Amino acid sequence: MYFFVTTAKALITADDETWMNLYLNTDGDSKTGWEGYDFILNRSRTDKTVSIERFVDGKWQFEKVGEAEYALCENGLMLAVSKTLIGGESGKALSLTFKWADHADIRGDIMRFMELGDTAPNDRFAFAYNASGLTDERTAEPGTETGTGAE
């Protein structure tokens, strides 16, 4: 799956844990993970990859489960995430909700999304992605025989 965010101004890269985080709720259950989010991406990064971490025991604690490749341009960031690392199955649709947060040093307090950093969407809202009506070809992993590269 690909996630892409654009910014109004040029991105200024930072090496801290709060730079351009992506929060994912992949099981559709608001009672699992931290405040419903099962994963946080990009708390750490290398030149080519960002971390994928699972929230542990519903707390602001993390367990690294893998990495995602990323690409950065002047005012955009794209993450290429394997569905199998975030609870999905290759070839099957995965519906989820997601939220981008930049420099939102929330430290486990979801209410701080309202006052710290930039978030999209704002406050406690999240974007919803529903792939339930897509065919197997449209939900395959990038680079596979049936993958279109447009997941």
What are these regions, as identified by a protein language model?
Residues 65-70:
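Beta-strand-rich interaction surfaces with strong enrichment in secreted/lumenal proteins
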